[in-house]
């Protein structure tokens, strides 16, 4: 079984170092002349799947599907399946975090044997990094990945993430714990990544980190694609910029969406060349 870290590296090499977001916000649906219903959600996702089929990674924002209940989850299941059928890696942006049996259930849902299972999922470590163990174990057993929140772009996050813990920031502690988990898993590209926002007030030190780094917040949210190189001292090849609204606002036309994605992919292509 090929681990997620290697599959991600191969996908980036073939299709470029970019993660495109599917964020079906009600305002976007209305802007695309779609109803804010499960049917409108399905139409939105169908357009995105067609436009994004040639990109490396696509990240559906799970919260926008949850708001439509069972029908929304049905759309998400279909979207994940269609993207994976197109050889796109799917990163479910679910930000799950819990303990014990509940964390195990989330693990089965998102990176185990489940219709919702994606290639990777985002997770919150703020119940203690050890609480993620069931998720990390299930992901590893199925060749899937986990991206752990470390330093986010929202201003509220700094109060926790920049707080001192054992002489380092909490965000740095998370990075170091993820790094240790990757090293324990053996050689090769790490399958556990961290999330560091493009506009995070203070990026942790990533110079010794060997896993992938998801970098959301590029584009409309203020992150500049040309300024990502060297983030936290990470190797440029580790970075995976994530873009949603900057591209989605080009819709609803499939050619226009695809072209917007290609422009952003071109803007971050230098990350793969280093």
Swiss-Prot record:
Its EC number is 4.1.1.23. Belongs to the OMP decarboxylase family. Type 2 subfamily. Disulfide bonds: none annotated. The gene is pyrF. Transmembrane segments: none annotated. It comes from Mycobacterium tuberculosis (strain ATCC 25618 / H37Rv). This is Orotidine 5'-phosphate decarboxylase. Was identified as a high-confidence drug target. It catalyses: orotidine 5'-phosphate + H(+) = UMP + CO2. Keywords: Decarboxylase, Lyase, Pyrimidine biosynthesis. CDD domains: OMP_decarboxylase_like (cd04725).
């Amino acid at each position: 079984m090929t681990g997620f870290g290697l599959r991600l590296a191969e996908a980036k090499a073939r299709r470029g170092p970019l993660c495109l977001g599917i964020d079906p916000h009600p305002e976007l649906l209305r802007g695309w002349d779609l109803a804010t219903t499960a049917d409108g959600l399905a139409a939105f996702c169908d357009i995105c799947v067609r436009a994004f089929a040639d990109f490396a990674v696509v990240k559906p924002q799970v919260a926008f599907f949850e708001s439509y209940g069972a029908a929304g989850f049905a759309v998400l299941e279909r979207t994940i399946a269609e993207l994976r059928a197109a050889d796109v890696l799917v990163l479910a942006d679910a930000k799950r975090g819990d303990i014990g049996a509940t964390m195990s259930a989330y693990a089965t849902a998102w990176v185990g044997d489940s219709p919702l299972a994606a290639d990777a999922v985002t997770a919150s470590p703020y119940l203690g990094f050890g609480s993620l163990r069931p998720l990390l174990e299930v992901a590893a057993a199925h060749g899937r990945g986990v991206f752990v929140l470390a330093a986010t772009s929202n201003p509220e996050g700094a109060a926790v993430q920049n707080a001192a813990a054992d002489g380092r920031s909490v965000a740095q502690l998370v990075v170091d714990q993820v790094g240790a988990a990757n090293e324990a898993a053996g050689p090769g590209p790490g399958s556990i990544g961290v999330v560091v926002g493009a506009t995070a007030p203070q990026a942790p030190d990533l110079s010794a980190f060997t896993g992938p780094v998801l970098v959301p917040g590029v584009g409309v949210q203020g992150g500049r694609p040309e300024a990502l190189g060297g983030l936290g001292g990470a190797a440029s090849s580790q970075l995976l910029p994530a873009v949603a609204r900057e591209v989605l606002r080009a819709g609803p036309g499939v050619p226009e969406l695809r072209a917007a994605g290609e422009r952003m992919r071109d803007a971050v292509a230098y990350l793969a060349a280093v």
